[in-house]
């Protein structure tokens, strides 16, 4: 096959990582993660990273890339991922990209929007406003000036809410106006796990309780003890931002679990809608991919 990569996307808790792992074994290739939270070290349970055992079976890239307090964005991801894709292809293999961070996948396929340079001074001011008035205050502002992008990222994505406001203040243009869709810059076979919302909801509830059993609370405590504070982007990941108030005595464990489930369901719903709008082929199991690959050959 003359392609640059195979992409397996989909909502959280939809089984895409398991499918990608089995396909990687079948094709004797390597996996590139497209998950914005798996890049952070020491955050294993809450991000549902592949186990160390699986990472011994198959080479995984873009996992444990930076410390939780280090800056990481879509631009950095694309630069690193494209370099890895090239390295894997030079080995005569087809890389498999798997993840649910659709902004990463979109940027890989269509390139990065030509926006203004980062304005760190303005960014600090916006972060200060978020801390004083709440993130919802900034999100409502973003909805007024760029409803399209606001609905795409959701109300809890602090980093992207602030960046979008920063761009609008400096350019007078909404962030969504910068990203013009062109032909893909890579030739890929794209798939996405197409579970029903009801199936996703059941999986999310089951996985949340599994994370609690596996020690999510202890993982959060360790992060705080290492000095990785709540305000950091990494600590805004679903699972961590809900557990920290419980650890600090500001909420009950029941409330933390309920909030994790609610926020995960909302995020999964946005992911599901995004992937359904793509030209990717819907799948449910690895057999669906095998059948598709066979149909291309025969």
From Swiss-Prot:
GO terms classed as biological process: tRNA modification
Record-listed E.C. numbers: 2.5.1.75
ATP-binding in keyword set: yes
InterPro entries registered for this protein in UniProt: Dimethylallyltransferase (IPR039657), IPT (IPR018022), P-loop_NTPase (IPR027417)
Region named Interaction with substrate tRNA: 35-38
Cofactor: Mg(2+)
Disulfide bonds: none
Keywords attached to this entry: ATP-binding, Magnesium, Nucleotide-binding, Transferase, tRNA processing
Ion transport as UniProt keyword: no
GO MF annotations, alphabetized: ATP binding; tRNA dimethylallyltransferase activity
Catalyses which reaction(s): adenosine(37) in tRNA + dimethylallyl diphosphate = N(6)-dimethylallyladenosine(37) in tRNA + diphosphate
Binding site for ATP: 10-17
Signal sequence annotation: none
Residues that, per the record, bind substrate: 12-17
Site annotation Interaction with substrate tRNA: residues: 101, 123
Catalytic class of the enzyme: transferase
Homology family: Belongs to the IPP transferase family.
HAMAP family in alphabetical order: IPP_trans
Assembly, per entry: Monomer.
NCBIfam families assigned: miaA (TIGR00174)
The name this protein goes by in its record: tRNA dimethylallyltransferase
Taxonomic source organism: Hydrogenobaculum sp. (strain Y04AAS1)
